[in-house]
């Protein structure tokens, strides 16, 4: 049965990020990675490839919001931009986020700062304190997966039907941070 899935956030220890303020773009954002995520489902290589394919099929880009919508709050006013240029490298899916001009006019609720400045400043100086969380339609099945030690383990493998959004959150499930650990992307 198809159901909506929101991954838990991923964080990174990366301190140097690819933030291009001139073009309102944050490059090389880790979207998802191979393995068991914080929601206890497993992203295999096929899932990552399908995620990249579905992301690149959306010619306008994949919607990104400031946090996930929930039953207590509307998502209206939380749009921040679009992800494009999806790709897989070393069993991790990456994309580039271009912030919409509206983020320069929209304030982070109760924080006294514009979304644009908050997101760009955090990406430059505290990329390990937030990440993104994919919102998909999919289902899962149980399958035997070989772990790093060569042992077989049963996992709930996620199957992707559609990619709805990838939201900026303070606690991502599908990654460890905004950027992949161990890569020096530099600041532009």
What are these regions (language model features)?
Residues 1-63:
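Polar/acidic, low-complexity leader/linker segments enriched in S/T/G and N/D
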Residues 11-19, 78-88, 140-144:
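Short amphipathic beta-strand and strand-loop transition segments with alternating hydrophobic
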Residues 30, 42, 73-84:
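Short amphipathic beta-strand/extended segments with alternating polar/hydrophobic composition
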Residues 32-36, 68-70, 137-142:
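Short, flexible beta-strand-to-coil junctions
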Residues 45, 56-59, 80, 92, ...:
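Acidic, Ser/Thr- and Gly-enriched intrinsically disordered low-complexity segments
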Residues 53, 68, 73-77, 87-90, ...:
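Basic, nucleic-acid-interacting segments
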Residues 58-74, 86, 132:
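Short conserved beta-strand and strand-loop elements enriched in small hydrophobics
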Residues 63, 85-188:
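Residue microenvironments linked to proteolytic maturation
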């Amino acid at each position: 049965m198809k159901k909506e899935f929101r991954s838990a956030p991923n964080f990174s220890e990366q301190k140097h990020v690819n933030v291009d303020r001139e073009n309102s773009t944050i490059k090389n954002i880790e979207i998802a990675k191979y393995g068991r995520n914080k929601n206890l489902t497993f992203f295999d290589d096929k899932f990552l490839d399908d995620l990249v394919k579905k992301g690149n099929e959306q010619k306008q880009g994949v919607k990104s919001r400031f946090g996930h919508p929930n039953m207590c709050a509307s998502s209206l006013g939380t749009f921040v931009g679009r992800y494009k240029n999806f790709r897989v490298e070393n069993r991790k899916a990456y994309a580039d986020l271009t912030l919409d001009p509206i983020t320069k006019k929209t304030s982070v609720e109760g924080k006294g700062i514009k979304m644009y400045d908050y997101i760009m400043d955090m990406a430059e100086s505290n990329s390990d304190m937030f990440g993104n969380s994919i919102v998909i339609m999919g289902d899962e099945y149980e399958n035997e997966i070989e772990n790093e030690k060569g042992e077989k383990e049963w996992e709930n493998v996620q199957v992707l039907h559609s990619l709805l959004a990838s939201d900026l959150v303070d606690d991502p499930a599908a990654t460890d941070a905004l950027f992949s650990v161990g890569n020096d992307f530099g600041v532009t």
